[in-house]
């Protein structure tokens, strides 16, 4: 399961990549094992663990903390163990299998790996095969039928489902598209959030305008009359889609 962004949606992929992951992997144990003893060791990895990335990895090999939210044994067959793991982003399954083998005493390694969830995107509901995408593009280009294309392409707003949202006035949209900061008077509605939380800024129609870090709590915003609400980090709305609502100062 690999979410892919195209055009403007590539800007939001950083938020998706930081979401939790679910993997199904095959671990091979290097000796005959007692099922109950191995199951007990595997379950002990649930919670916070220390991991140092493998030698062959794309990041620096620094010791770091990752959380295993759930680890489940799906099947055991001879020396093979089928696992389902829900974990933080950046958790290495091959290192997890290696560490389980060390604790058991005879070693283990990962044989196969499949990612079944990335953030809010799951294999059961969002997975699209390449041939399906190819067929959808063919139907759109040659038959002017966009039904399949709309099925396989998901609006980028979907990626903000787990991010607190702030809805703004239409009059503030173009100002933000030009780089202005979001001030209190431009806010129409909002969900609960804390200072420094990542928030998504939407139009009244639900279109994604920008994302950024909150400069105040939602409780503080409730009574505020002025001030900057969000420090914008990514702007998605194209300029001049919404009309300008500010005037230039006369010289």
Curated annotation (Swiss-Prot):
The entry's keywords: Isomerase, tRNA processing
Gene: truB
Catalysed reaction, written as an equation: uridine(55) in tRNA = pseudouridine(55) in tRNA
Domain of life according to the entry: Archaea
A GO MF label: pseudouridine synthase activity
Name of the protein described by the UniProt record: Probable tRNA pseudouridine synthase B
Organism name: Saccharolobus solfataricus (strain ATCC 35092 / DSM 1617 / JCM 11322 / P2) (Sulfolobus solfataricus)
GO biological process: box H/ACA sno(s)RNA 3'-end processing; mRNA pseudouridine synthesis; rRNA pseudouridine synthesis; snRNA pseudouridine synthesis; tRNA processing
UniProt-listed Enzyme Commission number(s): 5.4.99.25
Family of the protein in this entry: Belongs to the pseudouridine synthase TruB family. Type 2 subfamily.
Function: Could be responsible for synthesis of pseudouridine from uracil-55 in the psi GC loop of transfer RNAs.
Organism classification: Archaea, Thermoproteota, Thermoprotei, Sulfolobales, Sulfolobaceae
Residues annotated as domain PUA: 163-237
CDD domains in the record: PUA_Cbf5
PANTHER family, per the entry: CENTROMERE/MICROTUBULE BINDING PROTEIN CBF5 (PTHR23127), H_ACA RIBONUCLEOPROTEIN COMPLEX SUBUNIT DKC1 (PTHR23127:SF0)
